[in-house]
Amino acid sequence: MTDHRGAWLEIDLEAIRRNIGLVRTVVRPAAVAQVVKAEAYGHGMVPVSRAIEPVVDAFCVATIDEALTLRPEVGKRILMLYPVPHQALPEALEHDIEIPVMSAADLEAIQAAARDDRPPVRIHLGVETGMGRGGLPPENVVAVAAATQADPRLQLAGLWSHLHSPEDPPTSDGQLLRFDIATTALREARIPVPPRHAAASGGIFTGDEPSLDFVRSGIASYGVLDEGLPLAPDAQEAAARLRPAMSLKARPIAFSRVPEGGTVGYGGTWTACLLYTSDAADDVSTV
């Protein structure tokens, strides 16, 4: 069937790969886990993930459905960013999805679903540092980590948090202090500290949070950064070279000439103004 659509999105997969390369220049030697939740921010989770798998170390998703859709498409690690519904844990573990533990109840549910005949379940302990969306208080991390270590069916694969305001260094510093409390407590308990991750796109380029062992790159890899971020000096060049991977294109369906003072659109939201031209009217294209 002939495609008659008048507007479409074009996704530049090579631009995403280049942007990830720029992220690496900022965070190396830290590893890069690419966030592909919400259809890779609208860019298409499966085609994007296939294209970038050679240049990333892992993938991050938000829902178990996303994880299960992605699993047959890529061979690298897939990390959930939110707790898995307990009834879905057996399927998640069957497909080697890495699971966040945000409470003692989460750990108990994983232990109930874990099997002796499978590789150890890789879990990441989430630390509540101020985001307010759940997580272990720093003082509770040791108990949950010790329970994980004691279970041969489990592997402590990560310690993580998320800074909610990377544009505000004092707020981020306070969160990092709480994250460090958890890290120090593990060391004092002689529990090996697993790979740590806290930086998302904002933190990668502001330098407000350390790269630690790996970063979770989100919208930056698609060529977008929030306005007003106080960029770290050593990240400014890379930030300036990021390129949006998505283009919205459309075919014109009509052309018209609008005289000065004429309006366009519902409510006359645009008014022709001929201050900068000697023409008698503005050229308007409807797309």
Q: Can you annotate each of these PLM segments?
A:
Residues 3, 7-10, 15-18, 30-197, ...:
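Active-site-proximal beta-alpha core segment in soluble small-molecule metabolic enzymes
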Residues 23-28:
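Glycine-rich phosphate/diphosphate-binding loops that line cofactor/substrate pockets in enzymes
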Residues 42-44, 261, 281:
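Glycine-centered small-residue hotspots that permit tight backbone geometry or close packing
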Residues 76, 95, 246-251, 275:
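A generic structural signal for short beta-strands and their flanking turns/coil linkers
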Residues 172, 176-272:
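Anionic-ligand-binding alpha/beta catalytic cores of soluble enzymes and soluble regulatory domains
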Residues 276-283:
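Conserved small/polar residues in nucleotide/adenosyl-binding loops
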